[in-house]
A protein has these predicted regions:
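Short, intrinsically disordered/low-complexity patches at protein termini
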Residues: 41, 51-54, 94-96, 104
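Alpha-helical scaffold segments in soluble metabolic enzymes
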Residues: 42-45, 49, 70, 88-92
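Short beta-strand-loop/turn "lid" adjacent to the catalytic site in phosphate-handling enzymes
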Residues: 23, 32-35, 50-84, 111-121
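Short glycine-rich, Thr/Ser-proximal phosphate-binding strand/loop in the N-terminal lobe
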Residues: 5-41, 45, 118, 122-124
Length: 127
């Protein structure tokens, strides 16, 4: 029987991050690679390693991050905007959270969880 694993790929301004989860959404693998502005080859290498590590496996894959839109289009994979992705994960796994501050290589984002979700972003730089 072929198993299915779920993959999240975050392509940021400086790095590519991957998480692999089993059918029960337990984390079974993560990796973090600097892409040195070569996102295409870094994504290919990360996905090739995944296929080698988990042969005879089907994958569901979604991409997020500031550098993921073009990759998702090229690979014909779903793209989820990074603030939406973060919000969904926090609501599901840490529902008692009041606020999330996410610092990336390109920007900083803050999400307030209250009666109404409020999101703010500094697009100038992460600092």
């Amino acid at each position: 029987m072929i198993k299915t694993l779920h993959v999240g790929l975050d392509v940021g301004s400086t790095t590519v991050k991957i998480i692999v989860m089993d059918e029960n959404l337990n984390t079974i693998y993560t990796d973090y690679k600097r892409h040195f502005s070569d996102t295409k080859n870094t994504i290919c290498n990360v996905l090739e390693n995944l296929i080698i590590m988990y042969p005879d496996t089907e994958f569901t894959i979604a991409l997020t991050g500031s550098g993921a839109i073009s990759a998702a289009k090229f690979l014909d994979l779903p793209f989820i905007q990074e603030v939406v992705s973060c919000k969904r994960a926090v609501e599901k796994y840490i529902p008692e959270t009041d606020v999330v501050i996410e610092l990336g290589g390109e920007d900083a984002k803050i999400i307030y969880f209250d009666k109404f979700i409020e999101q703010r972003m500094n697009g100038t730089c992460a600092g």
